[in-house]
Amino acid sequence: MTTFSVPIDNGDSMKIAEEESQRTLYPYVTGTSIVAIKYKDGVLMASDMGGSYGSTLRYKNIERVKAIGKHSLLGASGEISDFQEILRYLDELTLNDNMWDDGNSLGPKEIHNYLTRVMYNRRNKFNPLWNTLVLGGVKNGKSYLGMVSMIGVSFEDDHVATGFGNHLARPILRDEWHADLSFEDGVKLLEKCMRVLLYRDRSAINKLQIAKITEEGVTVSQPYSLKTYWEFSSFHNPTAGAAGSW
């Protein structure tokens, strides 16, 4: 006769089951900068498609710009899994809004305020969502662009950038942005910013998407690459002239 030993449950399995599930305590797979601007017809947003596992460029096909409802566009840098969690929150929010069927829909300002409260709430629980979010949109003919940090700090502006782009792209935008930008000029300005980030940010890759939102809706471009030039002398010997270098 075959006998089987049955382990005695001392209650540990119940304790494990009852423990609250944990989210990201430290970022693992992250995306780099998002750059967004207002232009005369709406909002443009650019991001590359890289996902870094620590310092290793592990994934090269991650979309970090998503349409939210009818009037909004969301981009995120930081932890990819937390961005997916935020998208689940927003799916639930827009579903509940649509269930009212009252002819109204959430605009970009409402979604921006909602995300601000979500990020601040998670920060107060010492379990933040490890992202910086960019929210753009158009409703009733008015363009809207704002940003939320991982600790719930939010603001609106005519152009925003996250991550390394906040240091390298914003100076370019301050010099060259103006309110009457056409779509073509806006795309060229974003491509200039993304090219600078590609040269200087180790986490950036030469595969990007540019999304547009207007009163007509959201359009996200197919992934494409920028023309680059790597023959600058400083690229061949980046430490030349620095103290202690050869």
From Swiss-Prot:
Q: Does the keyword Nucleus apply?
A: yes
By its UniProt entry, which InterPro entries does this protein fall under? Ntn_hydrolases_N, Proteasome_alpha, Proteasome_beta4, Proteasome_bsu_CS, Proteasome_sua/b, Proteasome_suB-type
Report whether Nucleus shows up as a keyword of the record.
yes
Provide one Gene Ontology cellular component: cytosol
| A Gene Ontology biological process term | proteolysis involved in protein catabolic process
Q: What CDD domains does the annotation carry? A: proteasome_beta_type_4 (cd03760)
Active site location: T24
Instruction: Spell out the PROSITE patterns in the cross-references.
Output: PROTEASOME_BETA_1 (PS00854), PROTEASOME_BETA_2 (PS51476)
**Chief place where the protein resides:** cytoplasm
- What's the superkingdom here? Eukaryota
Q: Name one Pfam family in it.
A: Proteasome
Alphabetized PANTHER family for the sequence: PROTEASOME SUBUNIT ALPHA/BETA
Q: What does this protein do?
A: Non-catalytic component of the proteasome, a multicatalytic proteinase complex which is characterized by its ability to cleave peptides with Arg, Phe, Tyr, Leu, and Glu adjacent to the leaving group at neutral or slightly basic pH. The proteasome has an ATP-dependent proteolytic activity.
Return the similarity comment.
Belongs to the peptidase T1B family.
Q: Under what name is this protein listed?
A: Proteasome subunit beta type-4
